[in-house]
Amino acid sequence: MLETLNAIDSFVWGPPLLVLLVGTGIMLTIRLGLLQVLKLPQALKLIFCAKNDGHGDVNSFKALCTALTATVGTGNIVGVATAIKAGGPGALFWMWLAAFFGMATKYAECLLAVKYRTVDANGNISGGPMYYIQNGLGKQYKPLATMFCVFGIMCAYFGVGTFAQVNSIVEITKISAGIPVLYTGIALTILVAAVTIGGLKSIATVSSKVVPGMAVIYFLTTLGILIAFADQVPAAVALVIESAFTTTAAQGGFLGATVMLAMRSGVARGVFSNESGLGSAPIVAAAAKTNWPAEQGLVSMTGTFIDTIIICTMTGLSLIVTGVWNGELNGAAMTNSAFTSAFPAFGSWLLLVGLVLFAFTTILGWNYYGERCVEYLMGVKAILPYRIGFIILVACGPFLKLEEIWVMSDIVNGLMALPNLIALVALSGVVVAETKAYQQHLKEEAELVPVKLAEETNH
């Protein structure tokens, strides 16, 4: 089974998809004039200072936090560990590169989500790649939108949304606290059911309260590890850069890695972590209260910066400076070893709290993403059956194998990204035009011109 999945994964994440994924980010970076660098201060300011007086269901901050619930998850802890285990320290460099260009991609997809959003039968905002494919490219491209939704549901049901998160939670609770898998699975299922029944506003409320605090705590913990091993940090950074362009030899429990494997592992896990180009973040960005698509694009862009450039970097360097990356461990167990190396008395508990909160909120965010995909395909009546199915799969997650889960997640992530990337390339001219209009508005301090919501789409 694992060999078959690995073969499919190698095909899906082969050179064509890597070129399309990174190439789309490079193209958007050029067309937008290095926006992710020049406008980053403005974007960070907007997180807390956006006016939030336009159409939408939640404010920009809550929309960002909900997106971060799905991105800041096990990919930042377990995903980085598995990437380095498979591709060596050089995988971290390729995560950085993918994230840098991915910021432009995230900006573009979230801008388009607001521009082409619509209203569903319940009066709620609906948006995302399926809507900017259909309403931006034309209804003749609806099969592409359908393809995105099918793979989006697969991601939510069988990949990053449930199995990968649940499995990581039960693994770390068993390692750190000795709690049986069954008990953790039952408790997690009950908690997920309690929050998801409340829909987006319930998820957004939980996210806005949990995400900022947990991100700061995790950052400070990993910073403590780097301070404890400060003499190893320069060598670790040098190893990351060197390993990105040269084959890493086998050593200890590390089997060795080629440059291509480092690149594939880094980019694939980077997408798993920050979701730039995947098309998931635009689904919740569409619900933000804003009159300017570019404004929410800037806010959403910071998610990739926070997720990968900051959090994944701290995790990756912690694994390298402590020397656990080339040992026998993998996944959460590897990260746990790094934490206990620096903090023997309480390292496991710090990781336990961080990973459980990260993974739990990721489950909530992906429940919403899958819900919107189901609604697009089958209407609002299908939402409740979808939620029930999601909760059942959360209950099944603890009993699956870690290696198979991560490979399966990579596969469906790649398939989900494909239709979205095609749409981003085709609609890049719209992104540039909207960006220029917004920046000109800021210069002239003109009156806001609200974005008109499209009429409810009949599917």
Can you name each region flagged by the protein language model?
Residues L17, L32-Q36, G75-V80, A156-V170, ...:
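Transmembrane helix-loop junctions in multi-pass membrane proteins
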Residues D9-Q42, K85-G123, L144, D307-M314, ...:
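Extracellular loop-to-transmembrane helix junctions
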Residues T29, Y107-A121, L223-L239, T247, ...:
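Extracellular/periplasmic helix-exit of transmembrane alpha-helices
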Residues L20-M27, R31-L44, V166-T173, P180-I241, ...:
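Membrane-interface loop-to-helix entry segments
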Residues L34-S60, T82-I84, G88-L92, A104-Q140, ...:
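Flexible loop linkers connecting adjacent transmembrane helices
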Residues M1-T74, I84-A91, G102, A395, ...:
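N-terminal alpha-helical transmembrane segments of multi-pass membrane transport
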Residues T24, L28-T29, F101-G123, M130, ...:
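Helix-loop-helix module between adjacent transmembrane segments
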Residues G54-A86, L112-M130, Q134-G136, M147-V150, ...:
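Alpha-helical membrane segments and immediately flanking helix-loop junctions
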